[in-house]
């Protein structure tokens, strides 16, 4: 039987997505599987990895059935996943507790203590990243200090994609691109640093062996095949970080090429071919061997608009029932009627603390500039602009660190909004290309499998065959001039309020 199809699995924050692609990158079928985020306390955000697996099984069965292909026709499986999990497994492979996810900041005190005890510079020298509560490192220490009954049973710590690979194959692995979540990972050498493990208090035996993202870690077991509907023996590659796989799926594989992320969280990833680190940013390995990604990330990406729609769009939801027009599209329409700069309304998108470049887990979302003349449209447009202003902030820091961001390649749900994409182009002053596929992240995971099993000879071939452009946005110079002033206000606003955004 001809094996010419690839399956990509994306472990997102609110749902998984599974898609089957042909060799040309066309989607035969796709399905989602939802799961909750739990917020037990302020600053906490956690998920049950077994709920990820259940959702993956449901979505995989549905996808393969809708694709109308035999499971045995799938040549390989690739997995991408959200960052900075701390999935604690015992010796039998049982999940011991819910994992804190990327937006969880419960370990802030631990980070402050470790930075003082070890030294911020010494940690940064090894890891290429500052120690923040969002990362995996402090979450492991948090287990030790707050859940000793869990900690004493830990055999291995996994990331989101490596957990799904484990469920599919039984193999325990750690891919290169997710290594950056642990500050005992040497970002220059691409291996665990035993001395930093000791100083951080992380046992080396907790850490799986490092492998490349396109490495075949195993094949689908009989048990997994029965649960998810794939064929026993199907090769599975290690996969990688969702942002890095999305970067590949958007066609970003050479230095200077940049991916703009518009999913639940926002941000950017610039491809570089040499080590460049800045404590205000995030440095990780690309899913492509020999490349790094200099990244910036805001907690408030597309999630900002979903929050606004949920809390303030009762009228739009009512109209949706009458007209069928989605409430988000209606919000886009009212925002489009507002002038660039939202007539002075500025929004700080720090809805769950903030990551780069300010790294403040206590930062809060702020609307500034409201008066009786302002409307819902002003607030909607300000939300879009606030996320774009954060993107510009990250890009400017990255370029100051020596990276070169030329054209941005947009991915994620917000790329479907012509208005929002144009706002990002105007604010950053960068052209933005939108790939034809709206499944760049899942496609990137599938391409890892395609290269891993030999369906493509290399990543240049894979991208040239599968990644197409659907539209291009050029920055409007007049709007850019307005936004330059808005950006100054944005920076000054946080600077003025930062002393209030503390524990």
Please identify what each model-predicted range represents.
Residues 41-42, 95-98, 175, 293-294, ...:
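Short small-residue beta-strand/loop micro-motif enriched in glycine and branched aliphatics
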Residues 1-97, 125, 153, 225-226, ...:
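N-terminal glycine/serine-rich phosphate-binding loop of ATP-dependent small-molecule kinases
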Residues 33-35, 212, 475:
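Active-site donor-binding loop signature of nucleotide-sugar glycosyltransferases
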Residues 7-8, 20, 49, 108, ...:
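Active-site core segments that coordinate phosphate-bearing ligands/cofactors
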Residues 65-102, 130-136, 161, 165-185, ...:
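Short beta-strand-loop/turn "lid" adjacent to the catalytic site in phosphate-handling enzymes
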């Amino acid at each position: 039987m001809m094996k010419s199809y690839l399956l990509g699995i994306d472990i997102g924050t609110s749902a998984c997505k599974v898609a089957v692609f042909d060799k040309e990158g066309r989607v035969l079928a796709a399905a989602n599987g939802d799961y909750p985020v739990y917020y037990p306390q302020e600053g906490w955000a956690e998920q049950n990895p077994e709920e990820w697996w259940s959702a993956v099984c449901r979505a995989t069965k549905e996808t393969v059935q809708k694709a109308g292909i035999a499971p045995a026709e799938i040549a390989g499986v690739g997995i991408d996943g959200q960052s900075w999990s701390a999935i604690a497994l015992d010796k039998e492979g049982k999940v011991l507790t819910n994992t804190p996810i990327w937006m969880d900041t419960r370990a802030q005190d631990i980070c402050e203590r470790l930075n003082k005890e070890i030294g911020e510079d010494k940690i940064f020298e090894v890891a290429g990243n500052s120690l923040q509560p969002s990362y995996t490192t402090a979450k492991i220490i948090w287990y030790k200090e707050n859940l000793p009954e869990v900690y004493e049973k830990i055999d291995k710590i996994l990331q989101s994609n490596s957990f799904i690979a484990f469920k599919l194959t039984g193999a325990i692995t750690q891919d290169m691109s997710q290594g950056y979540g642990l500050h005992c990972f040497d970002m220059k050498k691409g291996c665990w640093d035993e001395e930093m493990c000791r100083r951080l208090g992380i046992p080396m035996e907790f850490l799986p062996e490092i492998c490349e993202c396109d490495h075949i870690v195993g094949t689908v077991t009989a048990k997994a095949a029965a649960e998810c509907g794939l064929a026993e023996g199907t090769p599975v590659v290690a996969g990688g970080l969702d942002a890095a796989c999305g970067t590949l799926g958007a066609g970003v594989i050479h230095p200077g090429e940049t991916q703009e992320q518009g999913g639940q969280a926002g941000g950017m990833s610039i491809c570089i071919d040499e080590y460049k680190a800045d404590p205000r940013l995030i440095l990780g390995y690309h899913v492509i061997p020999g490349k790094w990604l200099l990244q910036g990330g805001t907690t408030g990406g597309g999630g900002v608009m979903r929050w606004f729609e949920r809390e303030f769009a009762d009228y739009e939801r009512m109209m949706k029932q009458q007209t069928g027009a989605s409430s988000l599209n209606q919000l886009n329409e009212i925002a489009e009627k507002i002038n660039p700069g939202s007539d002075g309304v500025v929004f700080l998108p720090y809805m769950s603390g903030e990551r780069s470049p300010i790294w403040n887990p206590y930062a809060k979302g702020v609307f500034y500039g409201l008066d009786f003349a302002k409307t819902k449209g002003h607030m909607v447009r300000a939300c879009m602009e606030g996320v774009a202003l954060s993107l510009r902030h990250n890009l400017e820091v990255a370029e100051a660190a020596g990276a070169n961001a030329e054209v941005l390649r947009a991915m994620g749900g917000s790329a479907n909004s012509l208005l929002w994409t144009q706002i990002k182009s105007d604010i950053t002053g960068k052209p933005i290309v939108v790939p034809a596929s709206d499944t760049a992240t899942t496609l990137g995971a599938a391409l890892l499998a395609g290269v891993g099993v030999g369906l493509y000879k290399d990543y240049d071939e894979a991208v040239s065959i599968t990644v197409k452009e659907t539209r291009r946005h050029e920055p409007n110079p007049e709007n850019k001039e307005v936004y330059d002033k808005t950006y100054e206000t944005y920076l000054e606003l946080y600077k003025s309020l930062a002393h209030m955004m503390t524990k």
